[in-house]
Amino acid sequence: MAKKVVALIKLALPAGKANPAPPVGPALGQHGVNIMAFCKEYNARTQDKVGLVIPVEISVFEDRSFTFILKTPPASVLIAKAAGIERGSGNPNKTKVGKITTAQLREIAETKLPDLNTKNVEAAMRIVEGTARNMGVTIAD
């Protein structure tokens, strides 16, 4: 028989840098999960993606064991990395902070495809383009 899930925890953590300090410790500790076991496993599975923020969905079972699913990094993080900027514009309609090419946009859309609610790369590109526009990043051909 399948184990019963008692909690579903969603966190966004830097790849390869999870530690028991907040927000990881309190989120997992209240459900009785072995925090160090999670940190070691998360860091091992994300060590090749250092520098990105990787969202994780942790399922906690009634026997205090857990499993987790790694998601793709947020589109805003991928866009900022491609444009070479720290953060988006505070006023995206007036102040543009960077540029990405259509090829970079397609690459980001293909990376995000598993987590988006579409199977079409063109639709994914439009979704990511909207995020870029809201960050003050322009798309050059």
Swiss-Prot record:
Pfam families: Ribosomal_L11, Ribosomal_L11_N
GO CC, one annotated term: cytosolic large ribosomal subunit
Posttranslational modification: One or more lysine residues are methylated.
UniProt GO BP: translation
Single GO MF annotation: large ribosomal subunit rRNA binding
Keywords: Methylation, Ribonucleoprotein, Ribosomal protein, RNA-binding, rRNA-binding
SUPFAM superfamilies on file: Ribosomal L11/L12e N-terminal domain (SSF54747), Ribosomal protein L11, C-terminal domain (SSF46906)
Assembly mode: Part of the ribosomal stalk of the 50S ribosomal subunit. Interacts with L10 and the large rRNA to form the base of the stalk. L10 forms an elongated spine to which L12 dimers bind in a sequential fashion forming a multimeric L10(L12)X complex.
Function, as annotated: Forms part of the ribosomal stalk which helps the ribosome interact with GTP-bound translation factors.
Similarity comment: Belongs to the universal ribosomal protein uL11 family.
Official protein name in the record: Large ribosomal subunit protein uL11
Gene that encodes the chain: rplK
